[in-house]
Curated annotation (Swiss-Prot):
DNA-dependent RNA polymerase catalyzes the transcription of DNA into RNA using the four ribonucleoside triphosphates as substrates. The lineage of its organism: Bacteria, Bacillati, Bacillota, Bacilli, Lactobacillales. GO terms for molecular function: DNA binding; DNA-directed RNA polymerase activity; ribonucleoside binding. NCBIfam families: PRK00405.1 (NF001616), rpoB (TIGR02013). It comes from Leuconostoc citreum (strain KM20). This is DNA-directed RNA polymerase subunit beta. One of its GO terms (cellular component) is DNA-directed RNA polymerase complex.
Length: 1204
């Protein structure tokens, strides 16, 4: 027997075909959410208040400081928040201290800062009763970036951008003549030397002293930069030039220029690199990285002992760098301090680290490498040393030293997770509040004011509310199944505020990059406009403190060349320096490599390399892909486009009534279900004392009792059924973190998205043409693919101008048969079976005398009394919404429920539908092999196996070769063997069962080695010509169900302007008869059919009414009138000032209105006069009154539509 047994949880054992030992467990899969939010609570809030406060008033008398914060107990727990459509949030109280510097008085006070949403253990937020997820954002990291473009002559031109987290951008570039320019915040160009002068290095000799005179671009720029105004010093002149670029047209003085530059770059409140920006700049400008592979043009010695570290002319390789490295970290090694002139922007001295090197293009030429000194990593603004070192890197690029940056490299893109996104939003609110506080400080009496009086929390509350309610990154959670839910929490989006937009994103940003390896899944991404912009975090990926994605590698011992079990997490930048072997490189038991050379990755190259050069090794073959993709067995045999569809469609699988975990899994099913948040997980070890369908009680080892309440038949976000079932029994011992109860789409603790039917690849009467699926009726009868769907419907009783609405059983014009399931208040009973149009909540609305309809006016004219003045506004079951009433909730202010203003009562009705699989439903396997059910065949007519077993599903064999998803065929064969052997198997991605192992399993199960079987026709009993591939495959029913899509319109709403029927099921719209359909009817010469489609059935308003009348009276259909859209066209052209007229045969203008007139239709007023003047009309036969009435009705309809 190939393979070995592996236990997944307590309840499932699989035969695993993995040959690679797992050295690292898959991490907690929703940690990306929970850890980030925890950071926000522990550090983010303090950091943010630290940035904004202390707030001083304009005179410097008062100062408001942050002391501490505290989150109180939430008002509602998670379930109550769901039930009341409320937020799961806690009151945030902040302790503030107000100091009066004149009197020395200090006041401390707790200030309420609004309700702050809390994250649930599952990594979600509950906002207005609905679960939401904050998607992590993939953005460009702050830092300094160098790029290269070629001009039209093919000469390289370099550019540099310093990007802060917030604040002004600083850019350097060379023009066509090779002169170096600077732009501040995308304004007009300025010579680079002018910015250096503004920093306090005014003379040409100062500039050459810093940079040396060996750079052509610098020398040409100095030539162009002449002293224009002798009355100003060079520094002041440069400052004014900078000011003129930033504020053109305003009067410029040296002082205002200084203040402006300080505000733009050196004021921490307006310019922020964030810790990640400082880290990136220090890394990019550090001499450690820049000296590597350069030749020294001076001898470097130990400053203390004078001992030579490296001679002049030495090439600095890794060995030399390891000796140099400790010295480069010292603040006294090769550093020079420059003091700016007194009229500079900043007066502090600038320390630079400088080392001379040979030019690679001309060894006679000596160039300088200038580092930015040792700037503290807590310094969040850009410093003059950064600007000068950045200019030096820029000048060196033109001499062939240094590298340009790839902006799609994951070393230059970082993740903003929940905590940081929240912090940024909160900061916006606090900044708005800061202005208010300052104003109030200057208005109120400094001696009596308290922190509470200064603070206005409204901007803070509004910013947080807006973020959770309407930000692009705060999304309604996909809760179709556990995989979809977990995937949503691990999603990485490049869209959203501060990110890209769909239209601007090019192909490069969307493409797979070599740094995605082990960090971002190259497969799972949506098809369509968002392709490549929305990604998924790889299985082992994690996010470091700077927001870069790290992936784990096993360290290889440099001396013994053995693979150790020590794990290092590397960012994309760090990985570029190492050679990494693949996880499937064969190893001996002691960790040494079997072969002398192995396949490895170095940068973007895949190379075969000797083992003594290997630094690291992958931890697992599945570290490349995300959890969704890792759940596809034989992924390595599928084309990537189909694998993408497979990974995406697994998220759309509907939770079934009785799901089964796949017979052929990959081993990730247990971990995926466990971490998704839908399973009930034990908090501590103990013994199960009690189990039923609603709760599990576990007695801990310390005697404490834990009670776990299970979710029963709750409606999930997607309208699916959310139900938990216990899988432990009384007396069982459970460990901490063990699965106690399965959630939806789970079985025995594992993910179970579908079923394991018997599938054959064969055609059947053409019914599986074009990916259609032939189903066995047994799957319908035995509820194999049956799912439960729960929909909620609300009805509110409001106060209207004419009086309150009322929930009641007394509904006008309604028969007793429609009221049979309503109680005295008009509310449906739980358990009632309802169909389209049935009343769920009886409700009447008072009706004003003003809005009498035509019939009532007629009745009023005839009988002279008012009908009961209420209108039926009951909540009815919409089309396709029938089912069984599962629950009814009544909300009233008397019960302490918070309702919207003007609402006296709200009733919410939940209707459950049991949907069996039917023709038109979409189904799919895990390999992107999707199709729709085309026919359900009686069990006795289905093809059957030699032992009489009917096939469950027939798939078209044509769906395999061109799509190249061969994984499904391998799964089919291995699944059949597993079914026969009564086992579950695990075939992990890139390390699964080989062809030989599948053949061995088939042999072991006593099946033919090619996995094919003779199949007999169920209708004739004759064998089919050829043997057919038969086996077991995991097959799912997807959320695209025909019940949600089928739609037909009888009488429905019309668009206001064009009077044409609306479109779409939601609007109860019509079918669009488009341009090409018109051509088709024209081609057939079906003129009259076409005419009525374009008039009566569309927007001939008067014609519609007349046709209706004609049909009722049995008269011939009149000629059509003018379509409303033609009138709209005429009016539009007239609005453009064109004299457009409609002429008759004689050439006279015709009013469009005249074409609709019909004198036979009486206006209402005329009818009322008629009735009043002829009282004996009321004694006539009913038929005559009815005839008059129908005329009134039709006329009234015409009038209403004409007004529109």
């Amino acid at each position: 027997m190939a393979g070995h047994l592996v236990k997944y949880g307590k309840h499932r054992t699989r035969r695993s075909y993995a040959s690679i030992k797992e050295v690292l467990d898959v991490p907690n899969l929703i940690e990306i959410q929970t850890a980030s939010y925890q950071w926000f609570l522990d550090e983010g809030i303090k950091e943010m208040f630290g940035d904004i406060m202390p707030i001083d008033d304009f005179q410097g008398t008062l100062s408001l400081e942050y002391v501490d914060y505290q989150l109180m107990e939430p008002k509602y727990n998670i379930d109550e928040a769901r039930e009341h459509d409320a937020n799961y949030s806690a009151p945030l109280h902040v302790t503030l201290r107000l100091t009066n510097h004149e009197t020395g008085e200090i006041k401390s006070q707790d200030v309420f800062f609004g309700e702050f949403p809390l994250m649930t253990e599952q990594g979600t937020f509950i906002i207005n009763g609905a679960e939401r997820v904050i998607v992590s954002q993939l953005v460009r990291s702050p830092g300094i970036y160098y790029n290269q473009e070629n001009d039209k002559n093919g000469r390289p031109r370099y550019g540099t951008t310093v990007i802060p987290n917030r604040g002004a951008w600083l850019e350097y570039e060379t023009d066509a003549k090779g002169i170096a320019n600077v732009r501040i915040d995308r304004t007009r160009k300025l010579l680079m030397t002018e910015l250096v002068r503004a920093l306090g290095f005014g003379s040409d000799s100062d500039i050459i002293d810093i940079f040396s005179d060996q750079y052509d671009a610098l020398n040409m720029t100095l030539e162009k930069d002449v002293h224009k105004d002798m009355s100003d010093s060079r520094v002041e002149e440069a400052l004014k030039d900078v000011y003129e670029r930033l504020r053109p047209g305003e009067p410029k003085t040296a002082d205002s220029s200084r203040a402006l530059l300080v505000a733009r770059f050196f004021d921490p409140k307006r310019y922020d690199l964030a810790s990640v920006g400082r880290y990136k700049i220090n890394k990019k400008l550090s001499l450690k990285t820049r000296l590597l592979n350069q030749t020294l043009a001076e001898t470097l010695a130990d400053p203390d002992s004078g001992e030579v570290i490296a001679e002049k002319g030495t090439l600095v390789d890794k060995t030399v760098m390891s000796k140099l490295s400790p010295f480069l970290d010292r603040e006294d090694f090769k550093t020079t301090t420059y003091t700016p002139s007194g009229d500079a922007v900043l007066e502090e001295p600038v320390t630079l680290q400088k080392i001379k090197i040979e030019s690679p293009e001309n060894p006679e030429k000596t160039l300088l490498l200038i580092g930015n000194g040792h700037i503290d990593e807590n310094d969040r603004t850009v410093r003059p040393a950064d600007i000068l070192a950045g200019m030096n890197y820029f000048l060196n690029l033109q001499e062939g030293i240094g590298n340009v940056d790839d902006i799609d490299h994951l070393g230059n893109r970082r993740i903003r997770s929940v905590g940081e996104l929240l912090q940024n939003q909160f900061r916006i609110g606090l900044t708005r509040m800061e202005r208010v506080v300052r104003e109030r400080m200057s208005i109120q009496d400094a001696n009596t004011v308290t922190p509470q009086q200064l603070i206005n929390i409204r901007p803070v509350v509004a910013a947080v509310k807006e973020f959770f309610g309407s930000s692009q990154l705060s999304q309604f959670m996909d809760q179709t199944n556990p995989l979809g839910e977990m995937n949503h929490k691990r999603r990485l989006s490049a869209l959203g505020p501060g990110g890209l937009t769909r239209d601007r994103a090019g192909v490069e940003v969307r493409d797979v990059h070599y740094t995605h390896y082990g960090r971002i899944d190259p497969i799972e991404t949506p098809e369509g406009p968002n392709i490549g912009l929305i990604n998924s975090l790889a299985t082992y990926g994690r996010i470091n403190k700077y927001g870069f994605i790290e992936t784990p590698y096993r360290r290889v011992d440099w001396t013994t060349h053995m693979v150790t079990d020590k794990i290092d997490y590397l960012t994309a930048d760090e990985e570029d320096n190492y050679i990494v072997a693949q996880a499937n490189s064969p190893l001996n038991d002691d960790g040494s490599f079997v072969h002398d050379t192995v396949m490895a990755r170095f940068g973007e190259e895949n190379i075969e390399t000797p083992i003594d050069r290997i630094d690291y090794m992958d931890v697992s073959p599945k570290q490349v892909v995300s959890v969704g993709t890792a759940a596809i067995p034989f992924l390595e045999n599928d084309d990537s486009n189909r694998a993408l569809m497979g990974a995406n469609m697994q998220r759309q699988a509907v939770p079934l009534l009785d799901p089964h975990a796949p017979l052929v899994g990959t081993g990730i099913e247990y971990k995926a279900a466990h971490d998704s948040g839908v399973a009930m997980i034990s908090r501590a070890a103990g013994v199960v004392e009690y189990v039923d369908g609603r709760q599990i009680r576990v007695r801990r080892e310390d005697g404490q009792l834990d009670t776990y309440e299970l979710m029963k038949f709750r409606r999930s976000n997607g309208g699916k059924n959310y139900n938990q079932k216990p899988i432990v029994h009384e007396g069982e011992h459970v460990e901490a973190d063990e699965v106690l109860a399965d959630g939806p789409s789970m079985e025995k603790g594992e993910l179970a998205l579908g079923q394991n039917p018997l599938i054959a690849f064969m055609t059947w009467q053409g019914y599986n043409f074009e990916d259609a699926i032939v189903l066995n009726e047994r799957l319908v009868r035995e509820d194999v693919y049956t799912s439960i769907h729960i929909e909620e419907y609300d009805s509110e009783a409001r106060d209207t101008k004419l009086g309150p609405e009322e929930m009641t059983r007394e509904i006008p014009n309604t028969g007793e048969d429609q009221l049979k399931d309503l109680d005295a208040d008009g509310i449906i009973r739980v358990g009632a079976e309802v169909h389209d149009g049935d009343i769920l909540v009886g409700k009447v609305t008072p009706k004003g005398v003003t809005e009498l309809s035509a019939e009532e006016r007629l009745l009023h004219a005839i009988f002279g009394e008012k009908a009961r003045e209420v209108r039926d506004t009951s909540l009815r079951v919409p089309h396709g919404g029938g089912g069984v009433v599962q629950n009814v909730r009544i909300y009233t202010p008397e019960n302490g429920d918070e309702l919207a203003p003007g609402v006296n009562m709200m009733v919410r009705v939940y209707i459950a539908q049991k949907r069996k699989i039917q023709v038109g439903d979409k189904m799919a396997g895990r390999h992107g092999n999707k199709g729709t059910v085309s026919v359900v065949v009686p069990e006795e007519d289905m093809p059957y196996m030699p032992d009489g077993t009917p096939i469950d599903i027939l798939l078209s064999p044509m769906g395999v070769p061109s799509r190249m998803n061969i994984g499904q065929v391998l799964e089919l064969h291995l699944g059949f063997a597993a079914k026969k052997l009564g086992i579950h198997v695990a075939s992990p991605v890139f390390d699964g069962a080989s062809d030989d192992e599948i053949e061995a399993a088939l042999r072991e199960a006593g099946l033919p080695q090619d996995g094919k079987s003779v199949v007999y026709d169920g209708r004739t009993g004759e064998a089919f010509d050829k043997r057919v591939g038969v086996g077991v495959m995991h097959y799912m029913k997807l959320a695209h169900m025909v019940d949600d899509k089928i739609h037909a319109r009888s009488i429905g709403p019309y668009s206001l302007v064009t009077q044409q029927p609306l479109g779409g099921k939601a609007q109860f719209g019509g079918q669009r008869f488009g341009e090409m359909e018109v051509w088709a009817l024209e081609a057939y010469g079906a003129a009259y059919t076409l005419q009525e489609i374009l008039t009566y059935k569309s927007d001939d308003v008067a014609g519609r009414v007349k046709v209706y009348e004609s049909i009722i009276k049995g008269e011939p259909i009149p000629r059509p009138g003018v379509p409303e859209s033609f009138r709209v066209l005429v009016k539009e052209l007239q609005a453009l000032g064109l004299d457009m007229q409609v002429l008759d045969n004689a050439g006279d203008e015709v009013e469009l209105r005249q074409m609709d007139e019909d004198d036979s239709i009486l206006p209402v007023d005329a009818l009322e006069k008629l009735v009043r003047s002829n009282p004996d009309l009321l004694n006539k036969e009913d038929e005559e009154v009815a005839a008059a009435f129908s005329k009134v009705e039709s006329r009234d309809n015409t009038e209403v539509t004409d007004e529109n």
